[in-house]
Design a protein with these regions (language model features):
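Gly/Pro-rich, tryptophan- and cysteine-flecked surface segments typical
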Residues: 1-129
Length: 129
């Protein structure tokens, strides 16, 4: 009997933000962490949504089967070589061709007292594509 698949194909992260500055040796950033427990590679597509501008799409990553990938949002570039701007609130949509589990982490080093926040993304269900 086949093992049930863990996760979902569509996830959302409503609160994301890249601080514009860092203090010390640690750079402020956000990471979207993907876990693929399935037998096939996960082709992961990300889109960023903003309060006052059109979405940025075309971001892509691959998570091999039985592995995890930590996608640094500050280093992510889409198919047009665009990055997500700093100091602007945004949300993320994360879609995959197979079920995955998604967690989101923020390291804020704008002050010497570092802040680390992590949360599970919301499993929104099946991808339409």
């Amino acid at each position: 009997m086949a093992r049930p698949s863990v996760g979902a194909k569509l996830w959302v992260i409503p609160d994301a933000y890249l601080p514009a500055k860092s203090t010390g040796s640690l750079q402020s950033h956000e990471s979207t962490c993907v876990l693929n427990l399935g037998p096939r590679p996960a082709v992961v597509r990300l889109a960023a949504y903003f309060e006052d501008r059109e979405p940025l799409t075309g971001f892509r990553a691959v998570c091999p089967p039985g592995r995890t990938v930590h996608i640094r949002i500050d280093k992510l570039r889409n198919d047009k070589k665009q990055g997500i701007p700093a100091a602007v609130p945004f949300a993320l949509k994360v879609e995959s061709n197979v079920n995955i589990v998604v967690q989101h982490t923020r390291l804020d080093s704008t002050q010497s007292a570092l802040a680390l926040m992590t949360t599970m993304a919301f499993p929104a269900g099946r991808s339409r594509s």
